[in-house]
């Protein structure tokens, strides 16, 4: 073992502490020479800030002229269209008015329509009475209450009492449109934000999002409104609060039929929100927004020059400073376009939601721009209705009430199956084409070409082996901490077992029984923590348990900046392979990869991309992305989501086409 002795002498010469210690202490398995629990998030946020800075530079230039402003807005719209995905062809709405409830000066129609075949949407139409028809109308897009449109809407009552019809729409996962339910229609998750987040993972794999699907349902709701002769098609608005504010922001830039809008308790800047609070639930993000330099204010700006109102609370968890900065951009935009009076903001001494003062301003704004009426807002009776009387369906949920209803899971499975022949056609184009698309989906511009720098960070001599610690550095990437175990029985034919343990290399090495057999057989062990796990695990309190993902904030930030977390981990694996190719102990030895849990899909992708891997064995990991679509109540899905990947391949396809054997050990 002259090489090992030489390496140890070198370590001492470089001032690296070398000693012989036991294997019981967890600290013994740290390879990074620093410790910072939020290092990975800080690394990701640097990209968020860079992208935001580039966006700021572009918008400041746009403010110089009306032509520049229009060019900026059209650029935003085109980039938005590129990332939002495609929508189905429009079919028959098959709308049914299934009931009517009388209010004071208005009535509420209970309506069901199909936004696409088998997808039933439940809505309430608050229709003013004793008015000359057709009347102006608006969509109300619901916040995140599990009951959705519920038994009543105070804002809709006030609108209707002032001569504006309101169509209140149940979103996917709320009201009568829950998807994760038992046979009786009872929810299986604790709230709408959880259901939205779980469903969104499957949508993302298909190249869409829950936000995009909400847009489609809302678009079809407006289509329904415009089929009615009692609705004025030239005077249409949209508003929403909280999650409804999100839907409104995503909606107004793509539908020119909307003449006035209001966003409540959502408007701020994404950059600041991500830094202060982290990502929100699954319906509030479309992948690659940051990469495409689309900020929340940009979605609102696309409304210009049509009238737009922002409603905020001083004590809302939605950051007010970000809202004020975003509104300043709105003001500048509308001023440049010559219509400064068409944008306004109300900030009140309250928190989250559409309270009474905000409702007054909302209705006043809509009266002004939909009816050319600036008279005082007429008060409305605050009536209460029984939820059971307001249901559109017989059993309270469309998926257990409506013949032929399709759950979102079944819709997505059908879509996946329909694309089977397209995936086969794509995969038949050859490895060069497949690899190029794979790199694109992974968020990589190509295979990493920067040379790695190997830094030794420690060495321990044990009875049966030598233990070496390294951090592997590649420009622009997180360092990869790894531990090399060189058994005394190792020889020139010994294989390298590259072990990727989601629980961390330290946990694995702390149990001698885990690797005793490998030592006896003379196998070389290389254990590493890929970014975001092991030594760079994000503290648990930064991720809300309701999102069912231990690294939700980092996974969502990664998708936002256009660098899915799996793609980053593939780079880490390639860095480890470079280490095996370059280090004097490891050159010429075959590399077998053993991965478990979260690491499984990254190992499969790396094996397809790099022929230096001789075999892969995977345990306790997903075997196909179809699992996420069929059964979305799973943990840690976002760690392995690639936006639109299922248009091109599934994991079994990569296993079949890989140059090395890949097997599941369970």
Where does each model-flagged region fall?
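Alpha-helix capping and helix-loop boundary segments enriched in small/acidic/polar residues
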Residues: 146-154, 189-190, 205-213, 238-249, ...
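Alpha/beta-hydrolase-fold serine-hydrolase catalytic core, especially in secreted/extracellular enzymes
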Residues: 24-120, 304, 308-481, 485-497, ...
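Primarily recognizes the serine-hydrolase "nucleophile elbow" in alpha/beta-hydrolase
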Residues: 220-292, 576-648, 652-656
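Cap/lid segment of the alpha/beta-hydrolase catalytic domain
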Residues: 132-227, 268-279, 285, 491-583, ...
